[in-house]
């Protein structure tokens, strides 16, 4: 490809509204342009990368035995009503009506459509297992689109759906897709981790996310220092402390704390160690208990894990904190003064709090706390659960080593759905005994457009993008110095361009009438892995200059050897 016949569209300045590196560089490198909030046009350079991600994903999913199909982006609303997800999805599900006032949605995912398809097309166990996938545009009406294509409203996604006769078959399909994901991300040259995850709105039981590791990642991932255990912060189990609760050494005393509205203020003003404090959080209760509110009690230096809380039978979903008005109506005190002693509401205690002694907590009276609280003596312990986020140094749930935390960008997710959708939509087949059996489903997604942004977050420097070879828009750049003034430079560049392209190598030939500095800057910004510089001075010495984008090293290579040198670099 010649730059003179290509839409390069690079920018010198970083747009003001681009927050993260990938968004900045995708705009500057001429990969995307914003059309509206969360909507982007993919320019030629960006589309070349997107297609490479697509092709790698397609090849590995095909190799796993899945079959490609294509489903409509527009879906009948009635299918979503069958599964009950029409309400669970909330405003992210874009609803509209056609001219006949029939309700439809723009597809954020396709569990309902694929289940309806299999319900109609597959009738016998002899047709199973089957795994169908598509690479298709999706739409989620994000409340706050941000970070470019990382959190856009319209995005490209590979979504696959497996159907099996039993759980053993589902587990086999799930593992095959897990392995296919690993092969795809390995081929892309990305540093990633598969981690245990919560199933969220999709439903089902077993679930893993695939995260590209990057400091800018929105998600926090917990890893064992001595095993392969990995989980996102929502799923990582905070293991119960392996210590006995110490015997009381203090009497419980009521302390005036008029200016201590937070744990930090309590610690600063009264000299109590933060590890000896607890936070009492009031949340809306589910229908499983009679009380309107349930209290969750965690250590003062820990954070509530909302997903773990939502998964408790006693807690309403989605998690909703009680209002100040509700707190006062129930106990006569507000946030900052709540605690377990004398509390007339059901409460659940975190594992780390269950082993505490001589601790401080709100007295359920404004401006007062109890110090020296002990379980059993001053208040009954009651229900204990894992309520908190893990922290670095916690024991690993696998029993090996401790946890370390890193940031990651979720680019893929796999689920063992079970029969959540197939049962709701009566999707079954006749087994070998002629009995109708509801199918076991798995669903699998890769955010294709998100992978592009995640790869940039992991591979960049102050000059621009540093693409892994497998994802680069072009493999090689040819930069001829002052080509329009030197006939032999032009001839050498044209000859090399013809040779490399004839070999199937993707080359960007910069034939613009531009200063060398501009040409070099653009090639580095775009992130082409291998650059060949052709100039009169180097040709006088019988060589071209080869530059590696990742290492930055420049190497003189004999003109006669340059093609073989490039072939060796591309292996």
From Swiss-Prot:
Domain of life according to the entry: Bacteria
Keywords: Aminoacyl-tRNA synthetase, ATP-binding, Cytoplasm, Ligase, Nucleotide-binding, Protein biosynthesis
Subcellular localization: Cytoplasm
Protein's GO biological process: prolyl-tRNA aminoacylation
Record's GO cellular component terms: cytosol
Catalysed reaction, written as an equation: tRNA(Pro) + L-proline + ATP = L-prolyl-tRNA(Pro) + AMP + diphosphate
One Pfam family, short name: tRNA-synt_2b
CDD domains for the chain: ProRS-INS, ProRS_anticodon_short, ProRS_core_prok
Enzyme Commission number(s) of this protein: 6.1.1.15
Record bears the keyword Electron transport: no
InterPro entries hit by this protein: aa-tRNA-synt_IIb, aa-tRNA-synth_II, aa-tRNA-synth_II/BPL/LPL, Anticodon-bd, Anticodon-bd_dom_sf, Pro-tRNA-ligase_IIa, Pro-tRNA-synth_IIa_bac-type, Pro-tRNA-Synthase_IIa_type1
Role summary: Catalyzes the attachment of proline to tRNA(Pro) in a two-step reaction: proline is first activated by ATP to form Pro-AMP and then transferred to the acceptor end of tRNA(Pro). As ProRS can inadvertently accommodate and process non-cognate amino acids such as alanine and cysteine, to avoid such errors it has two additional distinct editing activities against alanine. One activity is designated as 'pretransfer' editing and involves the tRNA(Pro)-independent hydrolysis of activated Ala-AMP.
UniProt remark on domains: Consists of three domains: the N-terminal catalytic domain, the editing domain and the C-terminal anticodon-binding domain.
HAMAP family: Pro_tRNA_synth_type1 (MF_01569)
Family affiliation: Belongs to the class-II aminoacyl-tRNA synthetase family. ProS type 1 subfamily.
Subunit structure: Homodimer.
Protein name in UniProt: Proline--tRNA ligase
